[in-house]
Amino acid sequence: MLPVKRSKVAILGGGSWGTTTASVISRHCDTMLWARDGQIVDEINQAHTNHRYLGDAALNAKLAATTDIGAAVNQADAVLIAVPSSHFREVLASALSDLPMGIPLISLSKGLEKGSRMRMTEIIHDVAPGRIPGVLTGPNLAREIVAGQAAASVLALEDHEAALALQPKLNAGLFRVYTNQDVIGCELGGVLKNIIAIAVGMGDGLGAGDNTRAALITRGLAEMSRLGEALGGKAETFAGLAGMGDMIATCTSPQSRNRHVGIELAKGRSIDDIID
């Protein structure tokens, strides 16, 4: 009897969300994390931590990391890309020669490409044709998930059968993955809620009350739904984890970077100063 081939999943990006996702998936899949920084790679392999992004949180000891992007993606059954949208195209292009054909390429990035305003799945089509573009998104604060707290996410691929096949590999412990066929809506939910979260943060920074925050979130959701539908998504997608769920977490959590930006803007700081 031939041995059953174990699935291999590659994650590109050694930040908080890439590392967290890799640690979760490595519980029942061979998982290889790629990061540029050799110190982060060594720490993950030897100490099973990533202090720069996740503090003392313990990572799954089965997780392996490398600085060799070709080795990470070679023979992978799926590749998840967790790098900032500003570096998405460059990182994907650098992996292209070793990327298997026909596999899911899944964006974990919540942004648009500067200049072209392309979604990450559009960049996948542009740079790596012959693969299945998709997105994993939702209310996913990395530090909570790596600590083992319950969370849910949405997986949307252009091939829904491929999403259903991949779903069990991403489910682990209290991290539950649902599927959705609206790739555009799911992707835009993760992008547009950032704008509302900055506005909510500005309100919080100026001392606005809970009523103001609630108004910004609910009216922001209505605006997101209309814009998302105009751009090709489905309005109902924004009422789920990819829209409302993600927005609640981003607009209310002290861990939210976009809310933090809004708070600092309310103090009179410039956006360049905050980002630096």
Q: At which residue positions do the language-model features occur?
A:
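Rossmann-like NAD(P)(H) cofactor-binding subdomain of soluble oxidoreductases
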Residues: 59, 66-150, 166-168
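Hydrophobic anchor at the start of a short beta-strand
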Residues: 9, 31, 131-133, 177
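Internal alpha-helical scaffold of NAD(P)-dependent oxidoreductase catalytic cores
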Residues: 87, 98, 123-131, 150-198, ...
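NAD(P)-dependent Rossmann-like dehydrogenase/reductase catalytic/cofactor-binding core
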Residues: 193, 200-204, 229-239, 243, ...
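NAD(P)+-binding Rossmann beta1-loop-alpha1 motif at the extreme N-terminus of oxidoreductases
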Residues: 1-57, 62-67, 94
